[in-house]
A protein has these predicted regions:
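Catalytic and substrate-binding clefts that recognize carbohydrates or anionic sugar/phosphate headgroups
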Residues: 83-249, 259-260, 265, 272-277, ...
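Catalytic domains of carbohydrate-active enzymes, especially glycoside hydrolases
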Residues: 270-290
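C-terminal motif of bacterial Sec signal peptides marking the signal peptidase cleavage site
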Residues: 21-22
Length: 781
């Protein structure tokens, strides 16, 4: 009897242990909590990603909702389930998610320390009007309560001089120069993606709530991302959710010459020839609109304009001069094009006013799968003809004089107000998927004026639209790019010098415009894509601003040459972006989250892990209009984040972090600093990226701390990298030993250099050259 009781006690003791073990086995976990008004569904997608969907009782839940941006499916995950009378808590190895049973509000905490990350503070559902095309659906809203002094970033490209979102009110409705992505993240290392492609609003009330609202939805739908607080890990979570970035060809990272527009084959080829004759490095030249002829033939995707001789001569000339051709395409068509006729026949043209305003041009409906196939059928001809990159302009798209009737209009996927912000994702998806299905050997390259969360998976990057040539606009581009790329999309650029510049009397002879152009060019060395562009009739090839020997020409040329010198570093950043979900433009929160001053800065950032950039965004030589000031230099102050020692890139001076650093700069320099421990591979002097092999690279080491860098190489184009055909070499600096270790080469690819020399240049020491055969070697200069 006593033995039986003892055995029973043992069995009862084991039951909770067995139950705990069972519930902690990896599985897809989805829990539902109902209050007296709403249903709250929580789905664990992975240890670092949790989805929260809420809807009125009896409404539409997660299983019935379409997502354009999210590609991740729920993964089997170890989850601990804890339930009390007040709350249900799901805990992964990264986070704990607690649902209040009375209110349905969710609190997110760090799993390791239990620290609260973010708490919800109200969900609302306002029925759409009964006579509305979206009747039966809701205006949906979710509020949170971040800490009062917490920094928030993201929402895409806002054209705002402030990087932080605190105190901001933002209407999320894409338009030229504004790319709105409903994602925000915190200095704490968490991110929130609000999955609604329709008209939305973000509002952060100082000292109060942070609110996301969408005009149309069946439910609130958000993804909470958190991987222990590390910002690089958060970036990996974003790419896991929205898709991996693709590898762009090596040439994309060189210099692009673009203008609105080249008017003929002869004009474009002459510009390219002049670059080559003057020794101005260049990898891509761009043909803007109207190569198709008149507006009635808008975007025919053919060289119908007789001044282009069907395009074959131009394309051959570009390729024979070791350059690449990008060409403008649009999401709308003139009535004389075959695309217009086919799209009209299937009801896939949107009745909106768009650009061009004349000629009867109409936008196509990319939400219609058949329309996407028609679009590609005609675009394919340009690709087959040899065009290297597609410039997808106006992908918001342009929509002039919008009306309520326009917002009510039903696309193939729903009303315009409910889906419009997914337009750029869907149209670029159609191009990319068809491109890959055709089996082209060259990597896809798409530059698009608008974007959505996850668009990086379609070989796409954006630029900041038709910005004006003004100093305050240049200043706003810096946080615009940083808030955009922190949303998971690594590539971005601007029109160097600005697009609209008609207000500068004398054009490129105006010293004020020259100074702005030079400073914009110097900054763009440290932007993922370096592309010069302007509006007509002005032409801004760098030789338009002066002759060799004159400052406006020389400083632009020096900037372009520096870009090419940095190419091994830049292409290695590209490799890390794909292989490790890295970032090229890094807001200071990525590396200095504990430095409160660094978190508040909007005009400094890291280019890769090692280079801090502080662009000059105010005039010195001129008054910003036309008059020369007589000043040839000026003092600028840069805050250098704490926790690192820094080198002035230009002088080699060593500066401790945590302080402001002030010095005088001429027109030849902008403030650029290198972190101690950095290892920078420098390439040869070239006219285009593939001109010379990287058979003798300089490895610059900035001592003062241990350092690491991975040199990445592949064939420069093609998709073999997806099959593992690439090589990496780890470079490690041991500060105590004063030794650089060049590790064993990992991987290979056709055409790879089997041997090379490295010139190791440790600052302050005599350089030394080592021969490398793919095996580990050390250098102690």
């Amino acid at each position: 009897m006593d033995q039986s009781l003892t055995n029973m006690k043992k069995l009862l003791f084991l039951i909770p242990v067995v139950l705990l073990a069972a519930c902690s086995q990896p599985k897809v976990v989805r829990e539902t909590v109902e209050t007296d008004q709403i249903t709250c569904e929580v789905t664990v997608y992975s240890p670092d990603i949790v989805r929260v969907v809420k809807y009125p009782l009896g409404g539409v839940g997660a299983s019935q909702k379409k997502s354009y941006s999210v590609v991740l499916e729920p993964q089997k995950t170890k989850v601990k389930r804890t339930e009390t009378a007040e709350a249900l808590t799901l805990t992964t190895e990264k986070m704990a998610v607690s649902i209040d049973k009375a209110t349905g509000q969710v609190t997110f905490c760090d799993a390791a320390g239990g620290k609260q990350l973010l708490q919800e503070n109200g969900t609302s559902f306002e029925p759409r009007p009964a006579d509305d095309p979206d009747a039966g659906r809701f205006k949906v809203s979710q509020a949170w309560t971040p800490e009062a002094d917490e920094f928030l970033y993201g929402l895409g490209q806002r054209q705002d001089p402030d990087l932080s979102l605190r105190g901001k009110k933002v209407h999320l409705w894409n338009e030229n120069m504004h790319i709105y992505i409903p994602f925000f993240c915190s200095e704490k290392g968490y991110g929130v993606y609000w999955d609604n492609p329709g008209m939305s609003d973000f509002e952060d009330v100082p000292g109060g709530k942070t609110v996301m609202t969408s005009e149309v939805g069946d439910c609130t739908d958000l993804y909470f991302l958190y991987d222990g607080g590390d910002m690089d890990a958060l970036m990996a979570s974003e790419r896991k959710l929205g898709g991996k970035a693709t590898m762009f060809p090596l040439w994309v990272h060189g210099y692009w010459q673009c203008r609105e527009r080249y008017h003929s084959t002869e004009e474009l080829c002459e510009a390219l020839r002049t670059h080559r004759e003057m020794g101005i490095p260049l990898d891509c030249i761009v043909q803007d609109w109207q190569y198709w002829g008149e507006n009635e033939n808008w975007n025919s995707m053919r060289f119908d304009n007789p001044l282009y001789e069907r395009g074959d001569t131009m394309i051959a000339n570009v390729h024979n001069n070791h350059a690449h051709l990008a060409i403008s395409i649009w999401p709308d068509f003139g009535p004389l094009t075959p695309q217009f006729k086919e799209l009209e026949a299937i009801g896939a043209l949107l009745p909106f006013k768009t650009w061009s305003m004349t000629g009867g041009v109409k936008i196509y409906d990319p939400f219609n799968a058949q329309a996407r196939e028609i679009y590609w059928k005609y675009l394919e001809g340009l690709v087959d003809q040899g065009v290297d990159a597609l410039w997808s302009d106006s992908t918001e798209p342009d929509h002039f004089y919008p009306t309520k009737e326009d917002d009510d209009y039903r696309t193939a996927d729903g009303t315009w107000r409910s889906v419009r912000n997914a337009f750029p994702l869907v149209t670029n998806m159609g191009i990319y998927e068809n491109y890959r299905a055709k089996g082209y050997t060259k990597r896809a390259v798409q530059m698009t004026r608008s974007a959505s969360f996850g668009i990086q998976r379609y070989a796409t990057f954006s630029w900041s639209g038709d910005v004006q040539s003004r100093w305050e606009v240049l200043r706003a581009q810096i946080p615009s790019g940083l808030d955009y790329t922190i949303c998971g999309i690594p590539y971005w650029n601007t029109d160097i010098g600005g697009f609209f510049n008609w207000f500068y009397e004398g054009g490129t002879d105006n010293d004020a415009l020259k100074e702005l152009q030079v400073r914009w060019m110097q900054w763009s060395v440290f932007v993922p894509v370096m592309r010069n562009h302007t509006s007509g009739p002005l032409t801004t090839e760098i030789y338009r601003f002066g002759k060799p020997g004159e400052w406006a020409f020389d400083e632009q040329l020096n900037a372009i040459k520096l870009r090419y010198k940095l190419m091994p570093y830049i292409y290695s950043l590209a490799g890390a972006t794909v292989l490790e979900d890295g970032m090229i433009m890094r807001p200071l929160v990525m590396d200095f989250a504990k430095d409160r001053k660094a978190l508040s800065l909007s005009d400094e950032y890291l280019f890769g892990p090692s280079i801090l950039v502080h662009p000059v965004t105010e005039p010195v030589l001129t008054d910003g209009k036309a008059a020369l000031t007589g000043k040839m230099e000026a003092s600028f102050t840069t805050y250098l984040p704490a926790g690192a020692t820094w080198y002035d890139f230009h002088t080699g001076e060593i500066v401790e972090g945590g302080y402001d650093y002030t010095r005088t700069y001429t027109i030849s320099e902008i403030p650029v600093f290198v972190k101690a421990g950095a290892i920078l591979p420098f390439g040869p002097d070239v006219q285009y990226t593939s001109e010379k092999p990287w058979d003798n690279l300089e490895i610059a080491v900035y001592p003062g701390a241990d350092g690491h860098f991975t040199l990445y190489e592949d064939a420069g184009d093609g998709y073999e990298y997806e099959k593992g055909e690439y090589a990496t070499i780890d470079l490690d600096w041991d500060e105590a030993q004063g030794c650089l270790t060049i590790g064993d080469r990992k991987g290979s690819f056709p055409g790879m250099l089997r041997e090379r020399d490295f010139t190791v240049n440790v600052l302050g020491r005599t350089p030394m050259t080592v021969h490398y055969t793919g095996k580990r070697v050390q250098a102690k200069p």
